[in-house]
């Protein structure tokens, strides 16, 4: 980001962790750089939620959340949140909000209040289950790599522990698959995970990047066809692990037939 600085730069927008491969930014370092150059900083904090990361305490100016994710928590509301100093928020309200006129309905506001009441316990549950899923994937012979901030083999594990109190339910991994057909076999054998690209609700989801393979959007990503993102919901860990095990075993059987 330092090399991207230009004479007319006014804002640094970052996401940490990001929502596919979960690389982190050093928030204190970014904030220090921005203040040195009189730049405003805004971070997308949906991955960690307010429970697991508070970027303002590291010097970031403003925080935005997709409240449709963890804050709502039930996949039934579309909303966003912006947090910052009262003076800044007041200026946004007076100069931007009143111009754009965007506002959530009373019912959506009530749904967010409902979600906030259970947010801490949901995040705790999601993270505990996710840690068990990561541990299972780490020992499976068909798993090539794992992306998760609190995975101890992660190159940024130390930074994650410094900035975050937890890592939530999003992770990704790559499968030792030799073809799209093998990835299709993996997807077709998932019975518990729903194939969907959103996250933050109560149900567990799988998003294999090969779903985009025939679309124009695939050309915009450098992710390999054997890449899968998982969102771990509020279910018990055992059926989720069993589901992944069955799907991976189906791939192994297909690979074995190919070798014969």
What function would you assign to each model-found segment?
Residues 92, 182-186, 240-244:
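Hydrophobic side chains in well-ordered alpha-helices
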Residues 131-191, 197-200, 214-219, 259-260:
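Conserved small-domain helix->loop->beta segment predominantly found in fold-type I
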Residues 100, 189-198, 247-257:
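A common structural junction motif
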Residues 112-121, 168-177, 229-233:
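Short, well-ordered beta-strand elements within core beta-sheets of diverse protein domains
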Residues 83, 200-202:
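Positively charged, small/polar-rich N-terminal and surface patches that mediate targeting and assembly
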Residues 1-140, 147:
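Conserved PLP-enzyme active-site core in the AAT-like
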Residues 7, 122, 177, 204-260:
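PLP-dependent enzyme catalytic core of the Aspartate aminotransferase-like
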């Amino acid at each position: 980001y330092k090399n991207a600085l230009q004479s007319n730069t006014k804002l640094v927008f970052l996401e940490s962790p990001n929502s596919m491969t979960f690389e982190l930014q050093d928030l204190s370092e970014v904030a220090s750089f921005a203040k040195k150059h009189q730049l405003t900083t805004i971070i997308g904090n949906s991955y960690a939620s307010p429970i697991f990361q508070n970027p303002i305490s590291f010097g970031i100016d403003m925080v935005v959340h997709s409240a449709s994710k963890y804050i709502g928590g039930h996949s039934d509301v579309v909303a966003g949140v912006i947090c910052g100093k009262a003076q800044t928020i007041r200026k946004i309200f007076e100069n931007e909000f009143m111009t754009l006129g965007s506002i959530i309905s009373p019912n959506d506001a009530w749904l967010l209040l409902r979600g906030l009441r259970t947010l801490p316990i949901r995040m705790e549950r999601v993270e505990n289950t996710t840690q068990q899923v990561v541990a299972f994937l780490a020992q499976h012979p068909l798993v090539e790599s794992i992306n998760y901030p609190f995975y101890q083999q992660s190159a940024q594990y130390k930074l994650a522990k410094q900035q975050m109190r937890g890592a939530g339910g999003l992770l990704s991994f790559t499968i030792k698959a030799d073809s799209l057909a093998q990835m299709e076999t993996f997807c077709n054998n998932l019975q518990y995970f729903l194939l969907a690209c959103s996250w933050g609700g109560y149900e567990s989801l799988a998003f294999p990047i090969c779903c985009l393979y025939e679309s124009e959007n695939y050309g915009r990503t450098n992710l390999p066809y054997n890449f899968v993102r998982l969102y771990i919901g509020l279910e018990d860990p055992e059926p989720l692990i069993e589901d992944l095990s069955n799907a991976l075993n189906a791939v192994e059987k297909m690979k074995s037939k190919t070798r014969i």
